[in-house]
């Protein structure tokens, strides 16, 4: 049976016992509103570790002043049932006051990797991410931690943070889980209207177009980006905020593609801002 833990003290006590028993710990940090993408990460952890822990914490530090912190979906009962259905051992579900008794005096800065793409669109977002992830790593002390490739920039930043701060943690990037029509699973998909949901499938289709151009020999980023943007303009009513090609995981913008890249896009619908990407190995 999955145990719900709400305090740092209790979580640390459990972790100390697990480490004393030399049991391996897998960890999936989440903000709740669990979907099949989260469940895939949990299943991988269950296969690779003795104990699997997830956190459910809507971190206020990573939301901007006009973002959806207050309306972000929260359903701890439903989330617990989903986690229990796959066999998760512990859910760490602290309150904001438990995690931040007062505003943090010291916050981490994600640096150059956060100055592009989502970081440029959402200033301070990745600073909040690395601050809370670093804090969670210090509490849970996992051997492996799992992050979805849908947030590829976040994955690259967390990997760099672990390297820079010498966390003894293996970071595992998990492939995007998609709906049958290709839309990436996301907690924010529930915000889409019926028509927007129909249009949203074209985010993935536009990425497939970009990938096809690459596979057919196109290496000029500007041409791939234009074709992708033109496709999105024709097939969606959303505002196209980003279509970009960067090296991965270095996150350096590419004009002429040479090595591994990721093609990233963001489209803003009426109440949902969706992101998606494809990573292409060089």
Curated annotation (Swiss-Prot):
GO MF term list: ATP binding; pantoate-beta-alanine ligase activity
First-tier enzyme category under EC: ligase
Keyword match Cytoplasm: yes
Gene Ontology cellular-component terms listed: cytosol
Binding site for (R)-pantoate: 62, 154
The encoding gene: panC
Misc: The reaction proceeds by a bi uni uni bi ping pong mechanism.
Reactions catalysed according to its record: (R)-pantoate + beta-alanine + ATP = (R)-pantothenate + AMP + diphosphate + H(+)
Identification of the protein by name: Pantothenate synthetase
